[in-house]
Each structure stands twice: as C-alpha cells, then as structure tokens.
Amino acid sequence: MEGWSQVALVPLKNSNNNSNSNSSSNNSSNGVLVQDPISTVTTTVFDSVQNLVWCGDTSGYVRSLSSVKTSPYSIQLYPYTKFRTNTLNQPIIQILSHREGVLSLLNDQLSIYNRRGVPRNAVNSMSFKESNGRELFKDLKTMSFNCNSFNEIVVGTELDLIKVDMNKSNLVQQFNHTGKVAMVKEAPKLLALASSTGSLELFDPTSNSSIKTFSAHNGYMSDMDIKGNYIATCGNSIRPKRYHYHQAPEYTADPLVNIFDIRTMKAVAPVAFPAGVSSVRFHPKLPNILIVTSAYGLIEFVDIFDQTNVSVYHADMSAATPPLPPAGSSAAQQQKQQQQQQQQPHLSGLEISENGDFFMFNDGFSNLHLWSITNSGTLSKNFVNFPQEIERPDIVNGPSGVLGGGSGSGDGAFIDIDADVPLSVVGMPYYKELLLSNWPNDLKFVKEKARLPEPIDPDLLSIFEKQQQQKISQTPKWIPYDSLKYGTCNIPEYYSLTSQKDTQIPKFLSEKNGGQKQRQKSIQALEDSIFQCQNDEKIPNCYSRLQIQYSKFGVKDFDFAFYNRTQEYCGLENHSDNSYINSLLQLYRFQSVFYNKVVHSLSNEWLPNDEATIETNPEGSSILNELAYLFDMMFKAKSRNVKTYNFSQVMNHDKQAAKLINLNELMNLNSHEVRELIIAFNNYLLTRLSMDFRNQFNFNFDLTELAYEIEVRGRGHSCPIYDKQMGAMFSLELITPPHNMMSKMSILVNPNTQQDQQQQQQQQQQQQQQQQPTNLANIRKNLNILTYLEYSMNQYKTIPCTQHQHFHPHTLEIRTSITKLPPVLVLNVNLTNEEFRIINSLKQWLVPDLYAVRATNNGSNRGYSFKPSMPVSGDFKKYQLLGYVCEISHQVDTSRTGGHNLVSFVKIKDEWMFFNDYLVIPIPEEEVFNLTYSWKKPVIVIYQEVDKMDKVEPFRHITHFQGNDSILYRDHFAGPIRELYQREYTLLTREKEAPQPGTLVAIDAEFVTLKPEQLEISYNGQKKLVKPKELSLARVSVLRGGREGINSNITGNNNDDNNNISGMIIDDPLFGEAFIDDYIVHKSHIYDYTTNFSGIEPNDLDIHKSSKNLVTLQTAYRKLWLLLNLGVIFVGHGLYTDFRTINLQVPEEQIRDTADFYYKSSFKRQLSLKFLAYVMLKERVQKGNHDSIEDARTALLLYKKYVELNQKSTNEFEKMLNFVYEEGNRLKYRVPEL
C-alpha cells in the first residue's frame, strides 16, 4: 500500500450563535484555523451514498463537507450542510450513514436527518408509551445497524443493549444482556460488543444470547473494526500503581492489534505496533490489509497474513496549535483554552471511505486530515464506487431593480458592464484560494510583459513521432522523463520497511527507553514472527540480508545483542571485505578437531620479518595464524560480535586468493556465482591450511583429506592397457546421478524390507513392459544425499580405446573410487539450478547420520557404500551431520545479480543453531532438514566421524597460555634496524616481571585511516553513515602497572563487575615504564594519518623511509594476545574502540576503563582524558600531537587516583566526580589555554 499522502487539511471552524461568535475561533501561527475549546469535533464518518464527509461536535451540530476536485492532483472539501440536532448542546456521540440520510446519537436521543438537513425522525425517552422504554433509553453510548438490516438500530447503553426499529420508533426491544457496552459493531449474523473492561463479546441477536467472550485487553477497548470473518481490536492496559493504592488508574496504549476469527471462535496472530495503537480499520477492498494508527501520527498499512509486508507513514501533527484566549472571553472559557494549550495534538477518529481510496482523521483541534493514494498520477474524486449526485441549492437572482440597473427586470436580469452596480450583490461560492482579480494595482497587462506557455520539448515530439512511425498498435502509456532536464518529479516521500524487517524495537541503544521488560516483549514478538510465511516464495525474516546501521554515536550504539539469542556463541560482522566467508567460518569453528588443531598451532611462534616476505605479506602472518586468532576471539567473545578484518586483510594480500576477493557483499554476483565463490574459497581454505601447517610446523593437516584411486583397464582380450594412480583431495564434489540410475541407486543405498523390494521390482518390470521412462516421483521417497554420495565416490565410465582400435573395436574402463575417508567429510554441492529443483522436490535430502561401509570385490577394497542405518556386520564408520552452508536467493530470477546471501546451520551440543552474520538464534530441526523451498540451496555440507557413543573430540580452548611467549621479552623488528633510534621502553625480564593473572598493564593505541567513511546524502542535505572509515593499527604502547589486589573497602563506579577488586599493589620500581612501543609497518595506501590525534607522521610506517624500528602487525598482535591469555588486566581510557579496531576480545573482568569509572550517567557525557588529567592530576597532557605512552601513563595514574579515593571512603570518589562535572560545566569541558 505505497503512495499514500495527505491531499487536504480542512479546519472545521466553530460558529456558535452567541455574542462571542466573532472570537470563537482563531488563526494559529501557521495559518491553520483552530477550534474554540468550547466546541470540538467528536466523530467523523464517510457517507456511503454520496461524496460527503460528516462531522459531529460537542455542541450538538452535525455538518457535512462535499469533495470538489480542483485539479488532477488535488482535492478540496467545502461545507455542504450544517444543522443542530438538539437544543441542549449535548455532544454528538456517533454518526452512521443511512441510505435515507444520516443517523446521529446523543446521550438520550437518536435522530435521522436527510442529507440536506431536514429532520425525518427522532427517538428519545418521551417517544415511548411504556415506562420501561423510557427508563431504557438513556445514557446511550454506541449504536450500529442490526445484522443485515438498515431499519433496526442496536444501541448500547450504560446498563443494557436495546434495539430500535426506525419504522416503529415508539417500540423498543431489550436484549438479554447486562453490563455497559462501550462499542457495538455488526458482523455476519452476529454483533460484536466491546465492554468497558476490555473484553470482546459475540452476541447472537436472533437467539438473544451470548456466543463467545474474549479477554482482549487489560484496560478498556479504544477501537474495533470488522471485515468478513475477522475482528480487529485495540485498547489500553492499566499501569501498575506506583504511589498508593487509591491512586487513579493510568492507562497506556497496547502495542498489539488483536485479531479474532469468527469462524473458529479463536484469536489469531496479533499485529505488532510498538508505537501504541489508537485506531484500527480494515481496508474495504483488501480485507487482508489493516490500517493501524498511533495517537502521535504514525500510520501503518500491514498485511495480517504476512506482517513483513508493511508500509509506514507519519502524519504531520504539528500543523495544529491551540489558539490564544480571545479578548472578551469569560474566565471559564479562558481557563479551558489555557488547558487546551498545554495539550498536544493527537490522532483520533480514523475512518476509511467505502471504495478504499481515502481515509481521514482528526488531530484533536478540529482539523480534518484527508489522505489518498497519489502514486497513480491522478486522484480519485469519489468516496464511494457509484455516488449519487449531491442536491445543490437553487441559484436565486437578486432584486430586479438592482440587478437590472435600468436595463431589465425579473429573473435572468442582465448587468451591463457600464452599470453602476457593485458585483458583490451577485454573491460568490465558498472559496479559499486567491481570486484571479487579486492582482497588484500597478500591474498592467501589456504585450511585452505577457508570459506565453512553455513550448513542448522537441525531444518528446520526436520520440512520439518515432513511435508512430513504428506503427505501434496503441498509444504508449508514458514517455521517458529526463529528470536532469526537467527537474525532480512531484513524488511524495516513500516509506518502506523492506530492508529493515526487525523493527519491533529501536535499532540503536540510545533510542531505548522501555527498560528490560519492554525489551523482553519485543524479543518475544520477534521470535513469534521470525518464521511466519504463507507460501514457499516468501522468505522468513531470519534469512534476510542484514545491514548494520550507524547512528551519530557510531557502531557502539547498534544493538548487536538484540540479534543474538544465545549466551555463548558470537556473530560475525558483515561490513568488512569478504564477509561472505562468515557462514563457512562459523561451520568450521564448531568442528572440535578442526578447531583444536588450528587454535593450538598458536602455541608455536611463526613471525616472519624479512623484507621479501613483507613485500607480499605486509602483515607478516598466514591464513593459519589469522584463522587461529579468529577462532580464539570467537570463543572469548561469547555472545558479542566479532570482526573478520585481520583474516580478510591477509587473504586480500594472498595472490592465490585474488579471484576470491569480494568487496561489495555479493551484490555483483548471481545465485550460481555466489555458490561457486564460496566453494572456491572452501577449497582454497583447506588447501592453504595444509600448506601453512607443512611450511610453518612441518605438520601434515589431513583432517579432511580423502584418498582416491583411479584405475584404467582395457576391456579387449588383447588390450594391454592398465594403469593405476593414487591421489588425495580435501573436499568432494557431489554429482547428480543420471535419471536412469536414480531408481537403481535409491534401492541399493536405502534398502527396505524384502517385500518392498519385490513390489518395486514388479513396478519396474511393468514400466519396462509399457516402455515408459522412469518416473522420478515414484522413487522420490528413497532419494537423498546418500544416493549422490554413492555415485560421486564410485565413478565408472567407458571410452573408446584409441591405441588398439585397428585390431578390433573395444573400450577402456575408467573406475574412480575413494579408498580412505577422513574424520571430517566435506561435501561441495556445486549443482545447477535445474539440479537443485530435484533436491527441492525430495522429501528429505539431508540425513542426520550415515554409515560408510567398506565395499569389497573378490577380496579387494572397492571404495565405500553408504547406508542410512547401522549395518549388521562389516567394517563401517559412522558420520553425523555437523551442519551446512546454505545460499538464500531473494529473487525469483536467480540469474540476476544481488539479492543473494549465505547462512549456515550448525549442530552444537545436540541443538541446532542458525548463523546469519551477526544474527544467531536456535532453530528447529525440522527447518534445518527442510530443503523443499526453491530459495534454499545447500552449498557446503560437513559430516564428522563419531564413535559408538556419538561423541567427538572435546574442544580444548586456550584459557591460560603455556606455549612459546618469548616475543614478550625480545625485540623482533621488520626490515633494517635503525641503530640511531632512541627507544622509549624497557623490555620485560622473565625472571622478575613475567606477566601473571592480576598483573596491571596500561595500554593505548593509535590508528591511521586506510579508507574514508561512506556517506549517503539525501536531497535535503541530511547525511547518513553507510560504512565507517577503515582504521588500521599504527602504534601500540603497553606500560607496567603493578598488580591488582582485593580490597573490600573499594567499590567500583558505573561498573558493577569491578566492585571489591580494585586494590593496587605497586612493588615495581619501573611502575609506569613502557615495555612495548611498537610502530606497525604498512604497505598499502594510507588515506589519512590523523597526525593531530595519532601522532603518526607521514613515512613513519614506511619500511624504507621510516626513522623508527617497525614491526609487523602479527608481531604486535601476538604480544597483546599473549598478555590477554596470560590473564593480565588492561588499564586505559576508551578501550572499547581500541580493542574493537585491533580485533581483540577482552573479557570485562580484564578491563579497567577510566572512561567508564569517571562517568556519571545523569550527565550523559563522557570526559576526555585531557580534561580528566587537568582536573584530577593537575597535569596538562596532549599539548602537541598525541603520544600513546603519555596517554597510557595518564590513564594509569587516573586509575590509581580512583583506587585511592575509594580506599578512603565510599563517598569520597562520588564527591570528587561531582566536582569534576561541575568544573566541566564551568569550563565547557575544555582545558583552558595558557
């Protein structure tokens, strides 16, 4: 439902007949008329017969507005009739459109008027002869037509439910119902009643009994609508009493629209609307579309069967402002107007026209907002499909003597142009625009100043003529529009939620204000809707391509935790290069043997630093090392997100991976190219790991290695050709068997009982007798991955022999078989789209377990056969499905680029987990094995060998490092060593200063910018950060800081994890002395050195031009990684950004961040290191360029000061922090200049 916009804003001016009528309405500051608070609009409705809009107000007036289409693109509403329904100034409660007129409901009266304002009938308590009727007809609340009747009106009162026949208005019937009826609506054969307590009751007027009652809302029901067999309700809930028991109840709008099905008498899935629902309406022509609004102007069109199909608009509620009290008003009127000035405009009275082309609402100040669809180019002028003509008043001529001016008399008198008669005596229709006669006095219409129409562009004429010359059968619907030549089109702003399907809660942490309870409700709403889809073509939300959003606070403000439903498994960010590898890395991360071998390779040291290596590998690392670091960070991160930047950078500089680089998140690839890319990376990764193990540690990495044998034999008696070759590969390419072999192979791989086999053989014989081809549907239940695996591992084909063909024709047999299976079986499913359709048609292609049985032929091994169940005898291996990488096609046409992404399913501790970049959620097993969707294609499948107890090797995580840590105690420079360079650090000594758990070290890092940030600038100048700037580590300094001890008198500030553990023990004479000060070598282009903040000068990081001793990135990273795994505690200022850019996942218990300690949440401002040093330490730092050693030492001293203040008393630091912020307010948080 795109293309809606506001087409008219009508101020409903009050015109009470009193002495103050001239001052009963005012103009607001923006020109919109605002209603006198004495009389405001209470109800609105579209007419069901004519193009009219009806309004009722608090003074008992009913007025109508007629639509006039002023142009193809605009519409106006003009007053048509206005009449008063009573003399007691009772407010109009409700209006209904009737075929004979309009019905209006007051507190004790029901009346009907025709559309010209002439009364037809009125029913009140005095209309009934019986005293019972007089007692019933009071305190009226709501009304509706009875089921399938336009003459019978059902009215809800304070205590009863009654029925009035307008043809027999002196009789009233009481239904068998007690209790207050707040709203009543007609449904097919039933009445829907809303009570004051929030319940929904279905009442049968024929049997005069209640059918069903639903508990819809906790408080009261604010709106209700019915379409077909569905009822939609919205309401409010009672807030808990916060102060005392007798407190008046407070209500809050419910964030859900409840939907009830009349046929099943059950509630169906509600519609989420976090802004709070105030009104709800079904679309009259599209019963699946629901229009939901909030009191603050948010409008949403949502499909109740597919709630991801949403269109969102926002009404401009700022157009109405309450008027100032008019001069001469009474004190009561002025008091009411002053109360209204304090109120905010709110959306109410939502109504939609019968044809569904318009809807309207009131803003609380009697301004009527009319909306319509404008994306078709023109507006509809009708509110109903076939409107009746509106009766217009007759035009009466003025007095003949006046109009005639002496030239005529009577009707049709003519006014001469020279007659001395003012034209104002004729009268004018109602108008709001400036008249043509309103021109300046000095304006003269002369030929020289006349403006001629713009000529038609010749390009458009030539296009039209060319189309005519081509003899097009019909006139084209449009001609190409050149926006560069003619400017932007007048197109309304477009709102869509397609790219952001997870909108149940705010994206940014700074936007949250609902607390933990609201967050839990939002997460539950997301979990309920994540797999909701009505057909196979609609892809659930969890498979969507995710996009990280950036606020003004950066990526730290993005709520990654919302997308992770676990406590121990991390997600991977997708805004780095080559992010398509995330799904495969998650899969290998949870294969324990693979993980253990890779991660524990870090126990040994491999740090190449020669110039030849740095020219091609500036990071001085390898795929093995970076994958090991990444796996360890993924474990330590728990449920926090992790970046793959370091791994991707090493991959980018590897020449063997040149064809695997992807920098735009697969947007330039189609479905088949995406699958080929991830399979190629899988082969590269396994091959590269094997090479790295062999080159670095002389170790054979055969975890996934399959041994194969190729045998070539001549079939002729005299053909001597025979050859046998052996080989190995790290993954197996699955091949689809030919159709004529599928039937036979499905029986061999998936044997049933002997009786079933005989039945299948009989069926095959019958098919062969009838000479019909093999029907794949008959064997579909037996086909699965084992069929493909059996065929792929045991290849057999024949080719003509070319060497001995002249003797007699014969062929050569070529047999390929797998002779050895690895512990981890990696299968590449590189099939075509047509072959995937076969998999989609199978009942269950993947199997959770498989058994590999050694096949024998005359005593010799002939490969393997695969069974879905345990063999009775023989040598076999059991494999269990670990998971698979899956390609998701978001486009029906898979040949189109973009719209494809990769996800993975992994079995962890007997539970299936789903990984989609940083989205991590548990997933049902049925969804994992369901491959019947055309958009879901398995690409890489991994099975792992298990023992008889279905166990695999346990994970061996690195919690306390015990390997080679010698890099901490020596220098390891890259390239030439500058002897003249003066070192500013002193290396650690292993005997006295070996890092231990609890050792304090101060750290600070400086970065340079490799790539600038990417911004999206809208037409109005607003900027949106699409991708942040790419930073790289340039310098890191680490200082000695003593040890941390336990002190029960110390309490942390704003960091509960640090309570009672903040004591410092300083026994090192080199306290505050640096032991690491590394400058990182860079070979790639540096966009910005940011010298003012980093202190890095140009050429400082160039291996040939730098005056400093440089190290590779892996050398610096390994030092920090060793400190982390040795259990040291890092002290610094703003460590979140440093560790995130370095890609180091440090547990919170190992971080002491002074930016968090010296932070007071009530001020919502973090203090800079420079300002804290000035106030707390009485020192001036960062006087020139930043120096990482100085910054780290300052943070260490600030932490020492924090500990000292907490040791004195619990309130000492709190007092000092208040003083710091007071100084900040006085100095504007800046250090005064000298």
UniProtKB/Swiss-Prot annotation:
Disordered as annotated region, ranges: 12-32, 323-346, 751-775
Positions of WD repeats: 176-213, 272-315, 342-381
Co-factor requirement: a divalent metal cation
Residue intervals of the USP domain: 538-946
Domain Exonuclease residues, every copy: 1072-1199
The UniProt record lists the keyword Repeat: yes
Entry keywords, A to Z: Cytoplasm, Exonuclease, Hydrolase, Metal-binding, mRNA processing, Nuclease, Repeat, WD repeat
One Pfam family from the record: UCH_1
One annotated GO biological process: mRNA processing
EC number: 3.1.13.4
Main localization of the protein described in the UniProt heading: cytoplasm
Region (Linker): 383-537
Subcellular location: Cytoplasm
One CC-aspect GO term: PAN complex
Top EC category: hydrolase
Family: Belongs to the peptidase C19 family. PAN2 subfamily.
Record function comment: Catalytic subunit of the poly(A)-nuclease (PAN) deadenylation complex, one of two cytoplasmic mRNA deadenylases involved in mRNA turnover. PAN specifically shortens poly(A) tails of RNA and the activity is stimulated by poly(A)-binding protein PAB1. PAN deadenylation is followed by rapid degradation of the shortened mRNA tails by the CCR4-NOT complex. Deadenylated mRNAs are then degraded by two alternative mechanisms, namely exosome-mediated 3'-5' exonucleolytic degradation, or deadenylation-dependent mRNA decaping and subsequent 5'-3' exonucleolytic degradation by XRN1.
Subunit composition and interactions: Forms a heterotrimer with an asymmetric homodimer of the regulatory subunit PAN3 to form the poly(A)-nuclease (PAN) deadenylation complex.
Domain notes from UniProt: Contains a pseudo-UCH domain. This ubiquitin C-terminal hydrolase (UCH)-like or ubiquitin specific protease (USP)-like domain is predicted to be catalytically inactive because it lacks the active site catalytic triad characteristic of thiol proteases, with residues at the equivalent structural positions that are incompatible with catalysis, and it cannot bind ubiquitin. It functions as a structural scaffold for intra- and intermolecular interactions in the complex. The linker, or PAN3 interaction domain (PID), between the WD40 repeats and the pseudo-UCH domain mediates interaction with PAN3.
Protein name, as recorded: PAN2-PAN3 deadenylation complex catalytic subunit PAN2
Annotated source species: Lodderomyces elongisporus (strain ATCC 11503 / CBS 2605 / JCM 1781 / NBRC 1676 / NRRL YB-4239) (Yeast)
